[in-house]
Amino acid sequence: MSFSHSFIFIVIFCMQSLAALLQNGFMATVLGREWVRSQGLPAGDMIMACLAASRFCLHGIAVLNNFLASAMFWTIKNYFSILWDFTNTVNFWFTTWLAIFYCVKISSFSHPIFFWIKWRISRSVPRLLLGSLIIGGLSAISSATGNTIALQMAACENYTIYYKMMAFYLYYFRCHAMLMWVIPFFLFLLSIILLMFSLYRHLEQMRYHRPRTHDYSTQAHIMALKSLAFFLIFYTSYTLLLTVSVAHVINVHGSWHWAWEVVTYMGISLHSTILILSNTKMRKALKIKFPDLCIPRS
């Protein structure tokens, strides 16, 4: 790729990151103010506030990491890579909890276990969020340990031992990444499948009853599915692209690096837009802040 093409993708990446920082900063600020003012938030808004804050940090660290790598500041980049690992892991889990929360609250399954989860989920959200931070911390510690060992091995004069240890480190890092990303991803998929099945059952039941003018249950299903269906695409692409990068299936550290970064982070950037447009509080705050702004309905 020529320098001009690389420069274009650098500009696109910076603009995309700036938009994501503004979007997530806006969500975190609006919900954070309400959290402080009312001494609490509904469980769904609490997850969304934490998700917005984690994505704000994730995009900021991604920008720093990419420019530090371009400037060859590898030592400083290694420290920020540990922070990126923490925020990325936390972001995966916060996203999964939001999907599970939607599924539990909106779905209409009658199994006793499901009723028990529905009854407990709101009160369990603070502990789930704290657990996500703990998992992110453990992930960061594991990443820091691996980086330290890799740096020590780089100074080893025995090349046979060096190559064996580096091969082990790469295998360890890939397994670590897969464990931290794949588990929440499959929980997210399960939540969407259950929610879609619940909507299908609800629509089938409606065929045998007289249609109501305002079917709020169906509307709730459709609104959640619109948000989750779009994000299923974005979240899957983000997970797959990260997996490909870690597995080194494609060499993305060359001239195509910036194009790869644009595509990778595009998914979660677009999902932040969907979250703002599908949330009543966010739409209201946008309307107050920008009265002349035409906001499309979700």
Curated annotation (Swiss-Prot):
SUPFAM superfamilies: Family A G protein-coupled receptor-like (SSF81321). Several bitter taste receptors are expressed in a single taste receptor cell. The chain crosses the membrane at residues 7-27, 56-76, 97-117, 129-149, 177-197, 230-250, 258-278. Residues 28-55, 118-128, 198-229, 279-298 are cytoplasmic. It is found in: Membrane. It is a multi-pass membrane protein. One of its GO terms (molecular function) is bitter taste receptor activity. The keyword Membrane applies. This is Taste receptor type 2 member 134. It comes from Mus musculus. Its main location: membrane. PANTHER family: TASTE RECEPTOR TYPE 2, TASTE RECEPTOR TYPE 2 MEMBER 134. Glycans are attached at residue 158. One of its GO terms (biological process) is detection of chemical stimulus involved in sensory perception of bitter taste. Belongs to the G-protein coupled receptor T2R family. It comes from the Eukaryota. Putative taste receptor which may play a role in the perception of bitterness.
